[in-house]
Amino acid sequence: MRPQALALTATFLAGLTIHAAQKPFSSRPDLAAPDALSRFTVDGSGSWAVQDRMLILEKAGTPGGPIRRPSALAVLQSGPLVRATVQVEMRSTAPEDVKNRDLEIIFGYESPTRFYYVHLAGITDANHNGIFVVDNKDRRRIDDGTAPPQLKDREWHSVRLERDGTTGRIEVFVDGAAQPALRATDTTIGAGRVGLGSFDDTGEFRSLSVSGYPK
């Protein structure tokens, strides 16, 4: 075989290898299935259930332990994703008088002490309504902290997270907006699983879909 043909063949095979390594991941958990909850790893002290095609955080977790982090997570069982898009509808069921209500999307989950989370809340302050990383110590905010509150009521909200672990880009879109409500850039954790949760409140999630590329 001629050298040029060999080079072209090598390039073609390398392309196939890269494409195979980047085979996309896609999951839309059937929340109507009797065993739907088994698709998730429960982390923390909250109580979860599946009913009426919803993943329900029935009982809020209680923050505690050696580091400050969300107290109730349900992490989808999958391999680690380098790039991920998470779409979900969520509704807070915290009492009306709870102004700092929150619900979360988890991503880059490696372990109970190492993950990212998007914290959508009814107020914005140092600890609410932002993007945070837990890296074997108390959670740390990584966005600029200027976004207006995104979860001020008990209505359904559509949320989309886009995350690229190679560049560190993190963007969160709420209720179909063209511009992200929250954004950050961080590469502390390159890849991990995704999930849902709350720091210390209750809520409901439905129409969950996850797509992306594995590590």
Language-model segment annotations:
Residues 21-45:
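Extracellular carbohydrate-recognition regions
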Residues 49-72, 130:
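Short carbohydrate-recognition loop motifs
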Residues 66-133:
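Secretory/extracellular carbohydrate-interaction modules
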Residues 72-79, 144-151, 195:
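Beta-strand-rich interaction surfaces with strong enrichment in secreted/lumenal proteins
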Residues 136-158:
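Short, aromatic/His-centered strand-loop micro-motif at the edge of beta-sheets
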Residues 155-165, 170-172:
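Short tryptophan-centered beta-strand motifs in secreted/extracellular beta-sheet-rich domains
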Residues 173-193:
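Short, solvent-exposed beta-strand-to-loop segments that form ligand-recognition rims
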Residues 186-215:
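Ligand-recognition surfaces built from glycine- and aromatic
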